[in-house]
Amino acid sequence: MPSASCDVLLDDIEDIISQEDSKPQDRQFSRKHVFPKVRRRNTQKYLQEEPRPPSDSTIPGIQKIWIRTWGCSHNNSDGEYMAGQLAAYGYKITENASDADLWLLNSCTVKNPAEDHFRNSIKKAQEENKKVVLAGCVPQAQPRQDYLKGLSIIGVQQIDRVVEVVEETIKGHSVRLLGQKKDNGKRLGGARLDLPKIRKNPLIEIISINTGCLNACTYCKTKHARGNLASYPIDELVERAKQSFQEGVCEIWLTSEDTGAYGRDIGTDLPTLLWKLVEVIPEGAMLRLGMTNPPYILEHLEEMAKILNHPRVYAFLHIPVQSASDSVLMDMKREYCVADFKRVVDFLKEKVPGITIATDIICGFPGETDQDFQETVKLVEEYKFPSLFINQFYPRPGTPAAKAEQVPAHVKKQRTKDLSRVFHSYNPYDHKIGERQQVLVTEESFDSKFYVAHNRFYEQVLVPKNPAFMGKMVEVDIYESGKHFLKGQPVSETRVYTPSISKPLAKGEVSGLTKEFRNRLGNHPNGTSDTCPATQHGSAYSRMVLQMSQYDCALKVATGLALLALLLHFWPDSLLTM
């Protein structure tokens, strides 16, 4: 663990001084007039205590790093960016936690269980004597929690400085970068979109179009971490999408805390962005739109319906309702009523036939009565949502909802079970059997028995494992359905179709290593040169050469002192007393 602890929130790492450094008065003390005192019995000490070359564990840039991410797509994108930067600087990203020298734990603050897993991982890392760097919404929102003391933290808007934090942590320092990025006093969306990254799936690019939101939901802790809305400019988002397609990506996910609010802070809106993006989506690729709250999409229903009907945009939208009780929604400060939600869903179902609407529901929010809950049950029974995320309410520290009178735990648990039972009482895909569909194959199933594809409505379709299908559009006949999936058999005369998509990067390969970025690395004291691949430890090697040269110098000094001691040892005492 770090040898120095620091709970001060810093703007720059340069302000850190390790406990191993000399004290100021020691550094200023001059020894030029001091003659070494000779002790004959300790003559061999000079030879025995020679300086040693630095060990691999303290030379930044050559260690193995394990990255664990919890939470939403936005958080996963942040994790991919941090992995890419670390790999570009010479670190080895490993999937083996026990083999790693440092753990980078990227947290989620939405639910208590996610934070519990995060806390347990910190404890395990400490037990295994791993270096630790913390990231994500938990330490950003509450950096002074007891279990975070003495640990390095990288803020959600500072992920472009992850290399600095990791390097200092490896040296034994505890550093924290939690500030917001601003330009002329205006808050920026966060780190640059053109940073290198390692995609968890080389075929899928996750693009955060904005950070933060405009709401103040009484149960939400994420707002404490991500802050108010800050949108990325359209041209930067379009450029990132184009670069992704050039690297073989065939599916783009747009994500944020609320995609529907995009652009309100920079004088634009979500439909304007989407129309620009569909212009650059190649044939054979698809775009998936992330979560949007009802109030903001209400203003753009006509345009959104047109976009969701586009052949290269999934007819899918995630619209959280949270409760079907207006009184509960008011207590949540959700800024809409149930009628608004129904209006959005009904309009899109009419204008975008077959559209998939996913939603979220919280069971047992403070003040929720049995009647309130029954209203929510009726909503699920009416719309039969094919994708429903049911969450038992957990009070998050520091939120208004945590201070309210709580629904008894056993009641919350029972309501969660009851709603889950309603959800599992219907199968939304039975009517799809016998259909012929075009699907995009992007990954392997968890049990490794199938490839996972998605149809036009972002419904999961399992297909046979044929390597020729991966990353391609394939035509299949649907022959089976389950609660969360369909199964498709490729049509015998089908042709694999993706003529306009480049060959994807290999798994674990760093994306975004443009010439401009390589030049920036070359100018950085710890960077990789333009001619050195990211997989080589160029920066680490140069630092090791420097430290070894310092070691050689120290060795020469020690040898000189030892010879001087020997000379004085055999020198006649009479000459010393003259």
UniProtKB/Swiss-Prot annotation:
GO MF: 4 iron, 4 sulfur cluster binding; metal ion binding; N6-threonylcarbomyladenosine methylthiotransferase activity; tRNA (N(6)-L-threonylcarbamoyladenosine(37)-C(2))-methylthiotransferase
Keywords on record: 4Fe-4S, Endoplasmic reticulum, Iron, Iron-sulfur, Membrane, Metal-binding, Phosphoprotein, S-adenosyl-L-methionine, Transferase, Transmembrane, Transmembrane helix, tRNA processing
Cofactors (names): [4Fe-4S] cluster
Residues annotated as domain MTTase N-terminal: 63-171
PROSITE patterns on file: MTTASE_N, MTTASE_RADICAL, RADICAL_SAM, TRAM
Catalyzed reactions: N(6)-L-threonylcarbamoyladenosine(37) in tRNA + (sulfur carrier)-SH + AH2 + 2 S-adenosyl-L-methionine = 2-methylsulfanyl-N(6)-L-threonylcarbamoyladenosine(37) in tRNA + (sulfur carrier)-H + 5'-deoxyadenosine + L-methionine + A + S-adenosyl-L-homocysteine + 2 H(+)
Location in the cell: Endoplasmic reticulum membrane
Name by which UniProt lists this protein: Threonylcarbamoyladenosine tRNA methylthiotransferase
Source organism of this protein record: Mus musculus
Record lineage: Eukaryota, Metazoa, Chordata, Craniata, Vertebrata
